[in-house]
From Swiss-Prot:
Belongs to the YciB family. It is found in: Cell inner membrane. It comes from Aromatoleum aromaticum (strain DSM 19018 / LMG 30748 / EbN1). The keyword Iron does not apply. This is Inner membrane-spanning protein YciB. Keywords: Cell inner membrane, Cell membrane, Membrane, Transmembrane, Transmembrane helix.
Length: 202
């Protein structure tokens, strides 16, 4: 359930885009009414989907705050990035900004892991996981490096899809491609870590 909740803005973005794409005349009328004139019919689906994603992220944070009176830093970061890039897309009626949003998030994560390890000598992956698993120090370093590299590569991959494929293909990749690659990476990490956990506990 938590995974679905975390993915809610992405899922609603996808659903809104598909619904608006199947009803372009109505979507164009709605987008023009809410976001101003000068919007092309083909732009309406991505603009409405962006607005839905922003509202979903705000609602997500509101729900978490009402239940726990505390919001994770990651949610605030997600809100800031969707507000900046999504807001720019809505203001300028230009989908380029929202297409850069996943890359900005990936590179922020990858950069944070790298800078923390290289400059501050802090392994953030270890800090997050050491309460659950015990690993040799070299494995922690490789794990941190692997995640940093994964996020940086995902940022480049997002841009490649955004600039070399159709808008609809990018929207599909945003949900299914990104999440699918993340799942495969996590499974691969699990197999790799299981060997070292077994070695340490035997």
């Amino acid at each position: 359930m938590k995974i679905l909740f975390d993915l809610l803005p992405v899922i609603l973005f996808f659903v809104a885009y598909k619904i608006a794409g199947g009803n372009q005349a109505f979507a164009h009328e709605l987008a023009s009414r809410w976001l101003g004139d000068g919007i092309a019919v083909t732009q309406a689906p991505i603009l409405l989907a962006t607005a839905v994603a922003i509202l979903a992220t705000i609602a997500q944070i509101g729900w978490v705050w009402m239940r726990h009176r505390k919001v994770d830093t990651m949610l605030w970061i997600s809100l800031a990035i969707i507000a900046v890039f999504g807001g720019a897309t809505l203001f300028f009626h230009n989908p380029t900004f929202i297409k850069w949003k996943p890359t900005a998030l990936y590179w922020l994560f990858g950069g944070t892991l790298t800078v923390s390890a290289v400059i501050f000598r802090r392994n953030l992956i270890r800090k997050m996981l050491e309460a659950q698993i015990r690993l040799p120090e070299p494995v922690w370093k490789r794990l941190n490096l692997a995640w940093a590299g994964f996020f940086i590569l995902m940022g480049f991959l997002n841009l490649y899809v955004a600039y070399n494929f159709s808008e609809e293909a990018w929207v599909n990749f945003k949900l299914f491609g990104g999440m699918g690659l993340m799942l495969l990476f996590v499974l691969g990490q699990g197999f790799y870590l299981s060997r070292h956990i077994q070695e340490e506990t035997t």
